[in-house]
From Swiss-Prot:
The chain crosses the membrane at residues 39-59, 97-117, 139-159, 205-225, 239-259. It comes from the Bacteria. It comes from Coxiella burnetii (strain RSA 331 / Henzerling II). Pfam families: ATP-synt_A. GO terms for cellular component: plasma membrane; proton-transporting ATP synthase complex. Belongs to the ATPase A chain family. This is ATP synthase subunit a. InterPro entries: ATP_syn_F0_a_bact/chloroplast, ATP_synth_F0_asu, ATP_synth_F0_asu_AS, F0_ATP_A_sf. Its main location: membrane.
Length: 264
């Protein structure tokens, strides 16, 4: 990790916190406000998703019941751990929820893991191709974390309608938690409860990864003789953080869907 000598400390931090942007209104590499697509987030997340699918596909094709290899052992442990977690939290049909939970955990972990890559490495590679700004940690971008949390929110709504029906869900919204006589308050409470879920889910992941990335950038600004020691200490701690955050995102997704799928 090293800082660019031509930039001040503030400029260096700002440079690494800026995205490679595409204006969807006129398709130029400028900031288009709401109509802005962060290309770096899109590229890294898609590449990591494709890598995840490719690795699992290759290991599944080469799987053997006799003497499994290291990759097969690791994937089987991950699958069994996630399936056991889902089984404890979700008591309905797990044919969709278990694969979804596994996908979320592995994909979010891989995106979080990009925070451990030296802060100047990937931006420098893209800079050689003429890209001025490139932010390599997708989960440090709120647009991605909110996109994922909104997708979870849509699944929660789907399971609410699937398990309770429109009439059953309507009765639940109007009558709980204070009974039929306080229907307006019940509706307000329900809207707040459902609205907070995707917001907290997105901000928790974004906040932790954004802070972690910022600390790595600040370490890169320190003298070379202190970068290695502090970088190693923070890397070891942050390895725990990125794993826990991936697990929390997966776990809350399963819990929210489980609550929606419960019929009363």
């Amino acid at each position: 990790m090293y800082a660019q000598p031509k930039l001040t400390s503030a400029e260096y931090v700002q440079h690494h916190m800026s995205h490679w942007k595409l204006n969807l209104y006129n398709f130029t590499f400028t900031d288009g406000g709401f109509w802005t697509l962060n290309l770096d987030t899109l590229i890294i997340s898609v590449v990591l998703g494709a890598l995840f699918i490719l690795i699992f596909y290759i290991v599944a094709r080469r799987a053997t019941a006799s003497v499994p290899g290291k990759w097969q052992n690791a994937i089987e442990m991950a699958v069994e751990a996630v399936d056991g977690t889902v089984k404890d939290s979700f008591h309905g049909d797990r044919s969709l929820v278990a694969p979804l939970a596994l996908t979320i955990f592995i994909w979010v972990f891989l995106m979080n893991f990009m925070d451990l890559v030296p802060v100047d490495l990937i931006p420098r590679l893209f800079q050689m191709g003429g890209v001025e700004h490139f932010k390599a940690v997708p989960t440090a971008d709120p647009t991605l974390t909110f996109a994922m949390s909104i997708t979870v929110f849509v699944l929660v709504i789907f399971y609410n309608f699937k398990m309770k029906g429109a009439i059953g869900l309507g009765k639940e919204v109007l009558s709980r938690p204070f009974g039929w006589y306080l229907m307006p308050i019940n509706v307000i409470f329900r809207l707040i409860d459902e609205g907070v879920k995707p917001i907290s889910l997105a901000l928790r992941l974004f906040g932790n990864l954004f802070a972690g990335e910022l600390i790595f950038i600040l370490i890169a600004l320190l003298p070379w003789w202190s970068q290695f020691t502090l970088g190693m200490v923070w890397t070891l701690f942050h390895l725990l953080v990125i794993t826990v955050q991936a697990f929390i995102f997966m776990m809350l997704t399963v819990v929210y869907i489980s609550l929606a799928a419960e019929s009363h």
